[in-house]
Amino acid sequence: SGNRFELLLDGPQFFPRMLAAIAGAQRQVELELYLLTAGDCATQLVERLCQAALRGVQVRCLLDGFGSLGLPSVQRAQLLGAGVQLRLYNPLGWRRGLRNLYRDHRKLLLVDGELAFVGGTGATDDFWQPQDNSHAWHEVMVAISGPLVADWQQLFERQWPASLARLAWRPQPHNGLPRLPASPRQGDGLGRVAYADGRQHRDILHS
């Protein structure tokens, strides 16, 4: 309980909010993203991350090794040069065979351990074109504040070191999650983070 949720519809609504949150970060920023390709949207994101790192904020970016192939090497170098800690999840390798199919599809932005943005977006011009604040693809993100942010932070902290071994962290299986009451009071939202992957989804099915 004690959480606040705000549904943000489409890139023109959620990307400016996400960039503003990065710009206002005081201590730390964590970004976990699948799709990141060259364009104005990615440029805006990279610039905000670099600016945060240059003013002393700890910035960690975990990008999927396949989904981020479209990010130019010059922008990767820009991130590293500014002091951003950059890791790739499961970079492609010809010896890895079917293990190349293991991808990190999480889309998560955490700011100062107090604010989370989670949803389905990628950082491409299809989701947001900054020049005219337009979009081609429909997508949603949810802005979250409150105790639930700590659960998202925990997922990132688990996946961050696991990425070095090209592994996905998995919690212990459970027998299902308690059902949540409908329509909590505004500003007193109830929520739960349920982790799942292709082989571990029983908690969500039983919640």
Protein language model annotation of sequence segments:
Residues 1-207:
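Charged, low-complexity intrinsically disordered terminal segments
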